[in-house]
Curated annotation (Swiss-Prot):
Gene: coxA2
Subcellular location: Cell membrane
Main localisation: membrane
Highest taxon above the source species: Archaea
Linked residues for 1'-histidyl-3'-tyrosine (His-Tyr): 294-298
Organism of derivation: Halobacterium salinarum (strain ATCC 700922 / JCM 11081 / NRC-1)
TM regions (residue ranges): 5-25, 71-91, 122-142, 154-174, 204-224, 246-266, 288-308, 320-340, 358-378, 401-421, 425-445, 467-487, 506-526
KW Translocase (keyword) present: yes
Keywords: Cell membrane, Copper, Electron transport, Heme, Iron, Membrane, Metal-binding, Respiratory chain, Translocase, Transmembrane, Transmembrane helix, Transport
GO cellular component, one term: plasma membrane
Designated name of the protein: Cytochrome c oxidase polypeptide 1
Length: 593
């Protein structure tokens, strides 16, 4: 009874919080966080005639802001917290797996950490962190004042904190067992677990899905209607193309996932039989889940592809090779991603003729990805490479993406998948993509845009130490997982036979290297934001030399050179002030240019 009362109380509190957030944000037009300028942004979506107050000070600013840049920072902070939660979870798991027997944590806690890690990294870190960069930079890249629906933008973010609390409720509320379903929530296991943490996790996933859907609508409307007069479709940058495609995928995938979650909740709590053996079919859940789940992989990877396609040419001294083909391949991936879901189900006994068709489409979707890899490598070929931190992470992205992609092609072949299904090979392949590729692209973006966001430069040596530690750690961990998979080690087990101990210990060492690299990144970002040397140029990457000075950096130049900022009327910091107030030019410090 106490457990039921605790879950009901938490649910009521979350509902009250959501109602309060909606009520407050619905009255925020007078608190709008920017004042449109006639010479900065505008175009098709220019909003003239508005007069808005300046931003309130302190914490009130962050609770009431509807400025796309502030919301982008909120998404970034939220994603970083989620990344820390998921990272600590996996380090506990890998510490347990350093030995073949149970030593540190119980199998039930291991399963709870496994579930929390997967859902946190995919739904609370991956999608929100991409939204962070999209919110901050898409309006700048397309020369818009703000997102098309600023208040909806704020609501979409504020749905995420209660969603995270619900998802993590099994760890936060004493007396209830953690959800132990893995991130796939396969039936009948997810039906038979009696813990209310499973229901609260599903409600939290609903909130994250609604948030992502609202954000997708906003990105589509912004890119279609808010572009500047000089930004036509042929002029649209590659990051905006990938965000547009991603948003389309979200609109088709996430509502279906929400419907499947409702059916699962009804089965668990109201006696329906959608996924039970008695009246429905447990395999039906897998069809619904993977129809969402595989497009979700591309929801996560397409914007990082766009980030790499945007940043890599800047430090290659050449424009992106085959820009149109990169766009076409992005759209092709978006279409094909909905036709491959059953390759996750080759072992479930589906009709062999259906399996063959899904194998063919799964092999076909590798072609547009290969086009992108070819274009990235060709862009660097004979280029004047500058190995700054953003460029190093882009190169690391390409390397990890090739390994993750090639190992995925093998899994698309039915006879091979029947052997490797549900082994550590699948885990290694997937993590080469979700951390080795997606994570590296997000790190590249954080370094590339850091001077624009903060007006300061990060520390070069720390950034390079971050890269090499992350590269070595990720390859040690995920190559060891591929090795384990070839040996037949199944996934999702806290104990194993001793013959797998060496590979598991290597993976554990690599995981801790990844943890150290992340701490280096956090320290670099935090200290450089507060006391890093101010950039002495509005073109810190010398993009004008190669004719790659884009709209986002034009906004940064306008902000630095005008006395009124587009985000609230504060006085701008001139270049002279940047030198006389104690900052040092980036060229004379331990920073990159």
């Amino acid at each position: 009874m106490a457990t039921a009362a605790s879950s009901i109380t938490l649910t009521v509190l979350m509902g009250v919080l959501l109602v309060g957030v909606v009520a407050v944000l619905a009255r925020l037009e007078d608190w709008r966080s920017y004042t449109p300028l006639s010479d900065v942004g505008g175009g098709l979506g220019e909003r003239t005639g508005y007069t808005h107050e300046e931003k309130p000070g302190g914490i009130i600013r962050w609770f009431t802001t509807v400025d796309h840049k502030d919301i982008g920072i909120l998404y970034g902070v939220y994603g970083t917290i989620a990344f820390a939660w998921g990272g600590v979870s996996v380090l506990l798991m890998r510490t347990e797996l350093a030995t073949s027997s149970e030593t540190l944590i119980s199998p039930s806690l291991y399963n709870g950490l496994l579930t929390s890690h997967g859902i946190t990294m995919l739904f609370l870190f991956g999608t929100p962190m991409i939204a962070a960069f999209g919110n901050y930079f898409i309006p700048l890249l397309i020369d818009a004042d703000d997102m098309a629906f600023p208040r909806i933008n704020a609501i979409a973010f504020w749905l995420l904190p209660p969603g995270a609390i619900l998802i993590w409720s099994g760890f936060l509320i004493p007396g209830i067992a953690t959800a132990q379903t893995s991130w796939t929530m396969y039936t009948p296991l997810s039906l038979q677990m009696s813990s209310p943490a499973v229901d609260m996790m599903m409600l939290g996933l609903h909130l994250t899905g609604v948030s992502a859907t609202m954000g997708a609508i906003n990105f589509i409307a912004t890119i279609f209607t808010e572009r500047g007069e000089d930004v036509g479709w042929p002029d649209l940058d590659i990051f905006s193309w990938t965000m547009l495609t991603q948003s389309g995928l979200i609109l088709f995938a996430f509502p279906l996932f929400g419907s499947a979650l409702i059916m699962l909740l009804l089965d668990r709590n109201f006696g329906t039989t959608f996924f039970t053996v008695a009246g429905g079919d447990p395999i039906f859940w897998q069809h619904l889940f993977w129809f969402f789940g595989h497009p979700e992989v591309y929801v996560l990877v397409l914007p990082p592809m766009g980030i790499v396609s945007l940043i890599l040419p800047k430090f290659s001294g050449r424009k992106l090779f085959g820009f149109k083909f990169v766009v076409y391949s992005t759209l092709a991936i978006g279409v094909l991603s909905f036709g491959v879901w059953a390759h996750h189900m080759f072992t479930t006994g589906i009709d062999p003729r259906i399996r063959s068709s899904f194998m063919a489409v799964s092999l076909a979707i590798s072609i547009p990805s290969a086009v992108k890899v070819f274009n990235w490598i060709t862009t660097m070929w004979n280029g004047k490479l500058r190995l700054t931190a953003p460029m190093l992470f882009c190169i690391g992205f390409v390397q990890n993406f090739i390994i993750g992609g090639v190992t995925g092609v093998f899994l698309a072949v039915i006879p091979i998948d029947l052997i490797l299904h549900d082994t550590y090979y699948v885990v290694g392949h997937f993590h080469f993509i979700v951390y080795g590729a997606i994570g590296f692209a997000l790190f590249a973006a954080s370094y590339y845009w850091f001077p624009m966001v903060t007006g300061r430069m990060y520390q070069k040596r720390l950034a390079h130490a971050h890269f090499w530690t992350a590269l070595v750690g990720s390859n040690a961990t995920f190559l060891a997982m591929l090795w384990l998979g070839y040996g037949g080690m199944p996934r999702r087990y806290a104990t194993y036979i001793p013959q797998f101990a060496t590979a598991h210990r290597l993976a554990t060492v690599g995981a801790f290297l990844i943890g150290v690299s992340t701490l280096i990144w956090l320290f670099n970002m935090a200290t450089s934001w507060r006391e890093g040397p101010r950039v002495d140029s509005t073109d810190p990457w010398d993009l004008e030399e190669t004719d790659q000075f884009t709209n986002d950096w034009a906004w940064f130049r306008a902000k630095e050179e005008t006395t009124v900022l587009p985000d609230g009327g504060d006085e701008a910091q001139s270049e002279a002030d940047a030198v006389t107030d104690g900052g040092q030019p980036a060229a004379d410090s331990d920073t990159e240019s």
